[in-house]
Amino acid sequence: MELTEVSILGLGAEGSIAFRALMGKPCRVRILAKGQRAQRLKAEGIWINGVHYDLHVAEPGAEPPPRLLIVAVKGYQLEDALDDAATETGPDTVVMSLMNGLTSEEVLARRIGADRLIYCM
């Protein structure tokens, strides 16, 4: 699988680790956010281990679906986040969950399809 476009849904601790791991790789990484959070991330970027990163922030559905969607939200946010990100999964998109617990993969499989999931944690 060639990763040309990656979207990250949830830029907390796990999402930030994924973002940092993708820096310097030959792919375009976008952070999915909306409203005030999107505005703040666009304006301020993020700091990871003392290094500042500017971010490519996109509202869900504003750009074509990525090849990889990384889901890194809190469990209680998952259903709403998937509603927001429904347009982020095209026919060739695979989804990798960085979420803890057992139920998140069940929710993702039901909403997106088990055949499109990469099990990670």
Task: Give short role names for the model-derived ranges.
Residues 1-49:
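NAD(P)+-binding Rossmann beta1-loop-alpha1 motif at the extreme N-terminus of oxidoreductases
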Residues 51-53, 58-121:
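Rossmann-like NAD(P)(H) cofactor-binding subdomain of soluble oxidoreductases
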